[in-house]
Amino acid sequence: MTDLPDTDFTQRFIFDESDTRGELVALERSYAEVLAKHPYPEPVAQLLGELMAAASLLVGTLKFDGLLILQARSEGPVPLLMIECSSEREIRGLARYDAEQIAPDATLADLMPNGVLALTVDPTNGQRYQGIVDLDGTNLAECFTNYFVMSQQTGTRFWLYADGRSARGLLLQQLPADRLRDQEERDASWQHLTALASTLTADELLSLDNETVLHRLYHEEAVRLFDVQPLRFRCSCSRERSGNALVSLGLEDAQQLVVEHGGSIEIDCQFCNERYLFDAADIAQLFAGAGVDTPSDTRH
């Protein structure tokens, strides 16, 4: 295997004697970028890391060109977790929370009671798809496993861990019958491989490299590990997009906002905290059809 290109990547593997594939994800730099944007309490930071790991694994599983959006919503101390990951493996995320209601040892059920998990695939070309499942697992990994149980026949299992410094994940998924045609053999192989994966501890997945993880779990299996696929943090916000949002309000409302806000409107990106400032001259330019003045992108 070649040297790893970065701290953030996914890596696929397959079992030569079973109709099962797997994927591992490691996130450090992009995870740190997301956490640096807001002072997240530790339990919230852990959930964000787990959701980032899940999104990274899913982008490699759901073959499409476009954007994957994961949203967990609830009526509890964490009303929203949101991760976006593109097919180009660019990822960003955020959470909304009430810090005063979050205990250091809070569980998923404590943080997001009566919650739902929505998975949205927004392809560049084609129809948008969304699936929703209750947040009824003891952790996010169980919730994603439940989602796949409800939405498709293919067996899929997740293991997700994060500690505020790194986020890791493991996915196992059944493939169409090829090597094992007998259904009982397929079921037995699947149960065997997932049972071994369930022996993996959070400390092991968070601290060990992929080759060591796979050796510890499957040293008696024939496993092939493929090249890594890098990921990175990148926010898709821009001055142009912010300007388009103002145009959608209409000229009169946009001008009124400028007046109400003392001569300029400040639009903040919730993902990266970037700020875009628009004054009366900018509004006039937008509605004159000239678009956004590129040099003013530097104004925050």
Curated annotation (Swiss-Prot):
<dbReference type="Pfam" id="PF01430">
    <property type="entry name" value="HSP33"/>
</dbReference>
<feature type="disulfide bond" description="Redox-active">
    <location>
        <begin position="235"/>
        <end position="237"/>
    </location>
</feature>
<feature type="disulfide bond" description="Redox-active">
    <location>
        <begin position="269"/>
        <end position="272"/>
    </location>
</feature>
<protein>
    <recommendedName>
        <fullName>33 kDa chaperonin</fullName>
    </recommendedName>
</protein>
<dbReference type="GO" id="GO:0044183">
    <property type="term" value="F:protein folding chaperone"/>
</dbReference>
<comment type="function">
    <text>Redox regulated molecular chaperone. Protects both thermally unfolding and oxidatively damaged proteins from irreversible aggregation. Plays an important role in the bacterial defense system toward oxidative stress.</text>
</comment>
<keyword id="KW-0143">Chaperone</keyword>
<dbReference type="GO" id="GO:0005737">
    <property type="term" value="C:cytoplasm"/>
</dbReference>
<dbReference type="InterPro" id="IPR016153">
    <property type="entry name" value="Heat_shock_Hsp33_N"/>
</dbReference>
<keyword id="KW-0963">Cytoplasm</keyword>
<dbReference type="GO" id="GO:0042026">
    <property type="term" value="P:protein refolding"/>
</dbReference>
<dbReference type="InterPro" id="IPR016154">
    <property type="entry name" value="Heat_shock_Hsp33_C"/>
</dbReference>
<dbReference type="InterPro" id="IPR000397">
    <property type="entry name" value="Heat_shock_Hsp33"/>
</dbReference>
<dbReference type="GO" id="GO:0051082">
    <property type="term" value="F:unfolded protein binding"/>
</dbReference>
<dbReference type="InterPro" id="IPR023212">
    <property type="entry name" value="Hsp33_helix_hairpin_bin_dom_sf"/>
</dbReference>
<keyword id="KW-0676">Redox-active center</keyword>
<keyword id="KW-0862">Zinc</keyword>
<comment type="similarity">
    <text>Belongs to the HSP33 family.</text>
</comment>
<keyword id="KW-1015">Disulfide bond</keyword>
